[in-house]
Amino acid sequence: MVSWGRFICLVVVTMATLSLARPSFSLVEDTTLEPEEPPTKYQISQPEVYVAAPGESLEVRCLLKDAAVISWTKDGVHLGPNNRTVLIGEYLQIKGATPRDSGLYACTASRTVDSETWYFMVNVTDAISSGDDEDDTDGAEDFVSENSNNKRAPYWTNTEKMEKRLHAVPAANTVKFRCPAGGNPMPTMRWLKNGKEFKQEHRIGGYKVRNQHWSLIMESVVPSDKGNYTCVVENEYGSINHTYHLDVVERSPHRPILQAGLPANASTVVGGDVEFVCKVYSDAQPHIQWIKHVEKNGSKYGPDGLPYLKVLKAAGVNTTDKEIEVLYIRNVTFEDAGEYTCLAGNSIGISFHSAWLTVLPAPGREKEITASPDYLEIAIYCIGVFLIACMVVTVILCRMKNTTKKPDFSSQPAVHKLTKRIPLRRQVTVSAESSSSMNSNTPLVRITTRLSSTADTPMLAGVSEYELPEDPKWEFPRDKLTLGKPLGEGCFGQVVMAEAVGIDKDKPKEAVTVAVKMLKDDATEKDLSDLVSEMEMMKMIGKHKNIINLLGACTQDGPLYVIVEYASKGNLREYLRARRPPGMEYSYDINRVPEEQMTFKDLVSCTYQLARGMEYLASQKCIHRDLAARNVLVTENNVMKIADFGLARDINNIDYYKKTTNGRLPVKWMAPEALFDRVYTHQSDVWSFGVLMWEIFTLGGSPYPGIPVEELFKLLKEGHRMDKPANCTNELYMMMRDCWHAVPSQRPTFKQLVEDLDRILTLTTNEEYLDLSQPLEQYSPSYPDTRSSCSSGDDSVFSPDPMPYEPCLPQYPHINGSVKT
């Protein structure tokens, strides 16, 4: 007998009603059995296929003629009647079909002379495919076939997939809405956003509509994708609709979180194997390193007080997170004993956990040591007695010293003062030929700590106890400063709006709106040092029209207030986005009409002002290191002012830079030499200025849209650059390209940029309004930097010599020119 399990090819068409596929051919085979039994005639043909949905009734008819007795089998097992199976003549009925009823059925007709068998294939399956768009390759479809004579209005075929109406997803995720439906004739589907027709040009990157799956797919969602999405399914007999609500949540910036208790302490014998496991949870892509604490010249710490470290394992281009989270140590020796640290960092900060490895002697060596237990016990007792004696002597000496030098608190004032020097970092120029920024830990300010002698408070109870030296040139009376509403939180504390009476010396009785930086309630000594350092930096830099200027400070008789200029129109990125025309990509509200109409000259003027501000900072030997539209503020008179240039950043420990408050990764604004070599110069600021120009002429667009960070490193190394914005002239775009030259020395200076922009601004008239209704061009890495010879994988810009290792902080690995952040 032929084995049907090997030669039956089934084509199953999903249907709502029972359908029958007729055989296309038949083959008759006579088989001679034992002489005493009548010959059996098998009707071996392609089985008839019956398809039914779960719960439906199934009826199969045996088409054999002249059948005296008909018997039924399923998968070779005799089939008898029961509460769901009914056998009536040549008919087999199955009530309430289930997937278990699927299989190969056969009916055999027994006659006096011979017998004949007929086969059927039954398939009980859902009419609706369960495949998502991720499984499109399986060919499953959500279409439902209808009897051509049964006309029907649209209806939902799988409401379970539509129950979740509210979708809240993090930014950059993919969102899919589904509306599985049926009807006759087959209905059509269209999508609305906020009640209006949803078109491809309404979002950057467009969207996908999978009609065979009744789905809408949006990749890399952004906050502007928030809203109500309605699917409308209709044919000539009716229309139905269903609405989803999408909420895009900005990612919460947080340094990596390490699972408690991991890595765990471990012990093994010499020659054994051991592994440490470190579980890292991070929203932003983390960079993970395994570090071992080592000794040099018998010491675990260097002259600077930092421990000696050795990097054992770091993430590379082809390393997965699961691989880097496990550290294997094979064939352990005594030298492997010690402290091991799992260090993880992202753009927000770093976290680390440590564990100890104890190495025990091998069983053979242990016997040698235990051969003379008397000597070992004697040594232990001697050491113990010696330590106890030392402790007793130390306690006696301390008590004698305290007794002879105990101060008389009753004769002293209630408050004492202790002068504490806090080292403040500032930028200096190494030489006339180099504009790289270095560190100087020279104490700039002496800060006096107030100590209470009548309470058992710790010596440094809080930064609110500190007294700063008064600077008459900048000191401003507290009683003339009225604090207002909060404006936000910065690197060192919070910023509030305030009214300062008489801060403008030309108008001593007039109140001026200012911004005040202050520490938070839980601020640390380092936060105070950072804020004082920023204030001192702003004092040294001086004033300019296109930077945020220091107006004064309140340092006496209260918390530290740093008073700076107030910019009423917020940061430049949001300022530009708010002035986009309706319908433009990234537009948060397509129905909103912008308050002001931007002209081409406005954008050139904005760029020119920022170039002047950076030219001034460069002349003052100040390197910004985070130049971007988010760090530019706009005043009421549309004057551009560069902010955050006075932050005291430690450039030697810049591996993990703080993420900005709006969640953007600074690496997209960083020059290659800053990204890979940690070299920050005025030329690296010029690179960032080119990205800032791109932001301006795209009215607040996000650089390298849709490009992952790892892919960005590769593209920059190969010489790719962003395309020209749709509303930017070739001359301005070539200026951007010059700023993005791979060789820092080939980039223009800020002085040259000011001269070029001044010329362009002079030739530009106010009548040159921008046609911003056209969509912005998509970024495509198809424009390599053909003018630069520094795009090869072996170029020194992207494959630098390793820099001296710095303890406690992860290093960027130069593996194939890629860095994991």
Swiss-Prot record:
Residues that span the membrane, as ranges: 378-398
Gene Ontology, cellular component aspect: cell cortex; cell surface; cytoplasm; cytoplasmic vesicle; excitatory synapse; extracellular region; Golgi apparatus; membrane
Effect of N549T: Constitutive kinase activity
Entry's Gene Ontology BP terms: angiogenesis; animal organ morphogenesis; apoptotic process; axonogenesis; bone development; bone mineralization; bone morphogenesis; branch elongation involved in salivary gland morphogenesis
Positions with a binding annotation for ATP: L487, G488, E489, G490, C491, F492, G493, Q494, V495, K517, E565, Y566, A567, N571
Disulfide-bonded cysteines: C62-C107, C179-C231, C278-C342
Activity regulation annotation text: Present in an inactive conformation in the absence of bound ligand. Ligand binding leads to dimerization and activation by autophosphorylation on tyrosine residues. Inhibited by ARQ 523 and ARQ 069; these compounds maintain the kinase in an inactive conformation and inhibit autophosphorylation.
Organism (species): Homo sapiens (Human)
Keywords linked to the UniProt accession: Apoptosis, ATP-binding, Cell membrane, Craniosynostosis, Cytoplasmic vesicle, Disease variant, Disulfide bond, Ectodermal dysplasia, Glycoprotein, Golgi apparatus, Heparin-binding, Immunoglobulin domain, Intellectual disability, Kinase, Lacrimo-auriculo-dento-digital syndrome, Membrane, Nucleotide-binding, Phosphoprotein, Proto-oncogene, Receptor, Repeat, Secreted, Signal, Transferase, Transmembrane, Transmembrane helix, Tyrosine-protein kinase, Ubl conjugation
Protein name as catalogued: Fibroblast growth factor receptor 2
UniProt modified residues of type Phosphoserine: S780
Result when mutating P253R: In APRS; common mutation
Signal sequence bounds: 1-21
Region Heparin-binding, annotated ranges: 161-178
Family: Belongs to the protein kinase superfamily. Tyr protein kinase family. Fibroblast growth factor receptor subfamily.
Enzyme class per UniProt: transferase
Recorded disease: Crouzon syndrome: An autosomal dominant syndrome characterized by craniosynostosis, hypertelorism, exophthalmos and external strabismus, parrot-beaked nose, short upper lip, hypoplastic maxilla, and a relative mandibular prognathism.
Residue spans of biased composition, Acidic residues class: 131-144
Annotated phenotype, changing E565A: Constitutive kinase activity
